[in-house]
Design a protein with these regions (language model features):
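Short, charged cytosolic
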Residues: 2-6, 50-70, 151-167
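A membrane-cytosol interface segment of integral membrane proteins
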Residues: 217, 292-340
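Short, strongly hydrophobic alpha-helical membrane anchors
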Residues: 1-23
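Membrane-helix interfacial "entry" motifs
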Residues: 21-26, 69, 73, 77, ...
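Coil-to-alpha-helix initiation sites in intrinsically disordered, low-complexity, charged segments
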Residues: 5, 13, 59-67, 73, ...
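Specific transmembrane helices
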Residues: 29-116, 134-146
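Membrane-embedded catalytic scaffold of the fatty acid hydroxylase/desaturase
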Residues: 87-99, 110-111, 120-295
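Peri-membrane helix termini and adjoining interfacial loops of integral membrane proteins
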Residues: 4-11, 108-117, 164
Length: 340
């Protein structure tokens, strides 16, 4: 029987990887980024209301009901988000997928291979200017890896079956960002580790190994700023567009909401996380001219399969098995909307 100390350690671990996330200043679901997202949404809703009515008066109760409607936050889809968040946090910690392959392991392997070939790492420059440049480089590298992994999740049928769990959300709250099949999360981590490991290793070989990027609360400065500056509104019902010019540089919450649209004209658009110029290169950029009414989810014929925890975890595996073992190459599965 475990000692009290061991039990307390286990309890602390469970807390840290579940509810503790909300108190981790480096996590996008921590209280500070959520509060900033609330402030932005509150201002936007009040401003639009004032433009519509011509009155500067703020109806606090009405505004709060608009920001936190029961029909969204207590929707069955949202409840599944909350459940899958807790289950995944524990499951992914248990398999420790992030330590199986990390950017550090990949970059160190590249450096060791370079040493075998007789290549020497250049001496490091720890000046602030280089640290800023390196931070920008790492942020671009991370965003590129996240974007191309996201692109593959939509274009490769087997990966789409896993990623479909995320897109099956019928309403969106900030927790929807954590609505992922564990294998989907594993693939994303693998792509990021490979890409960033190669990029970090290449930088170390050329400009020096000891350059440290700038961090804020344990997160890369650029990514932390992005998370605080409204990231949580990407998965929400609040439409915020940056305008045509800035939408071509940064992915706005509205653009990501379009990405989640079940309308066919919005399929496979806006794969970027921070920057939208990756989508310009891929030919997948969609910049809404005006506010659009967006219905979230996947095809109505498939949606019922993803309205339970069992469906969210088991259905993708079953469909992948049928694709690989039971269905002839190229043949669509029953209920497949063709969104691959």
């Amino acid at each position: 029987m475990p000692s009290n100390s061991a039990f307390e350690d286990q309890l602390a671990t469970v807390w840290n990887i579940t509810l503790g996330v909300f108190f981790d200043p480096g996590h996008f679901l921590s209280l500070f980024p959520l509060f900033i997202a609330f402030c932005i949404a509150f201002f936007v809703v009040c401003h639009r209301r004032q433009q519509k009515t011509g009155s500067a008066e703020v109806n606090l109760r009405r505004t709060m009901l608009l920001l936190f409607p029961r029909r969204i936050f207590l929707h069955n889809s949202a409840k599944l988000d909350y459940a899958i968040f807790f289950i995944n946090q524990i499951a992914l910690f248990a398999i420790a997928f992030s330590t199986v392959l990390s950017p550090a392991i990949v970059s160190n392997s590249i450096l060791e291979f370079g040493a075998v070939l007789g290549l020497q790492t250049a001496s490091a420059d720890t000046s602030l200017a280089l640290r800023i440049l390196y931070t920008v480089y790492i942020v671009l590298l991370w965003d590129f890896s996240a974007t191309y992994a996201h692109y593959l999740k939509h274009k490769v049928p087997v990966l789409w079956e896993l990623h479909k769990v995320h897109h099956s959300a019928e309403v969106m709250t900030p927790v929807t960002a954590m609505r992922r099949h564990p294998l989907d999360a594993l693939f994303g981590a693998f792509c990021t580790s490979i890409t960033m490991g190669v990029g970090i290793g290449a930088w170390a070989m050329i400009l020096g190994q000891d350059v440290m990027p700038i961090h804020v609360f344990g997160s890369l400065a650029g990514i932390w700023i992005w998370r605080v500056a409204g990231y949580n509104l990407r998965h929400s019902h609040v439409w915020i567009s940056y305008g045509d010019f800035w939408n071509r540089i940064f992915i706005s919450p509205a653009q990501h909401q379009v990405h989640h649209s079940k309308s066919q004209e919005h399929y496979d658009k806006n794969f970027g996380h921070i920057f939208s110029f990756w989508d310009s290169l891929l030919g997948t950029l969609y910049c809404p001219k005006n506010a659009e009414r967006v219905r979230f989810g996947i095809g109505d014929d498939e949606l019922p399969e993803y309205r339970s925890l069992t469906g969210l975890y088991i259905t993708p595996v079953g469909k992948i098995w049928r694709r690989l073992a039971g269905s002839p190459a190229g043949e669509k599965l029953q209920g497949d909307t063709g969104r691959t």
